[in-house]
Amino acid sequence: MKKPSQLSATILTIFVILAIGVMVKETLGQAPSTCFEALKDASKGASCDSELCASLCKKKSGGGVGTCRTKTTQPSKGQPECHCRFWCKSDGTPYK
């Protein structure tokens, strides 16, 4: 059987490891990630207004970058739409 001081040290070590794990998990959950959203207001029919796209994306998130791109990987096919890329929280809400 272990001595009481050894048991206390073992229990303390376990709690310290658990506390560090919880802190790391909370920190990683708050780390910014890149989000993407197609903004329909800048895309009208077969055209996309690049200035309006950039401005709407900046309104969504201060560091957002808006570009007009086609929905498909082949630029000659498909209609252009406003793609907004921005930093967001883990729940998808943008950083302001």
From Swiss-Prot:
One of its GO terms (biological process) is killing of cells of another organism. Disulfide bonds join C35-C88, C48-C68, C53-C82, C57-C84. It is found in: Secreted. GO terms for cellular component: extracellular region. Its main location: secreted. Keywords: Antimicrobial, Disulfide bond, Fungicide, Plant defense, Secreted, Signal. Residues 1-29 form the signal peptide. InterPro entries: DEFL (IPR010851), Scorpion_toxin-like (IPR003614). It holds the Pfam family SLR1-BP. It comes from the Eukaryota. PANTHER family: DEFENSIN-LIKE PROTEIN 144-RELATED. Belongs to the DEFL family. This is Defensin-like protein 151. The gene is LCR17.
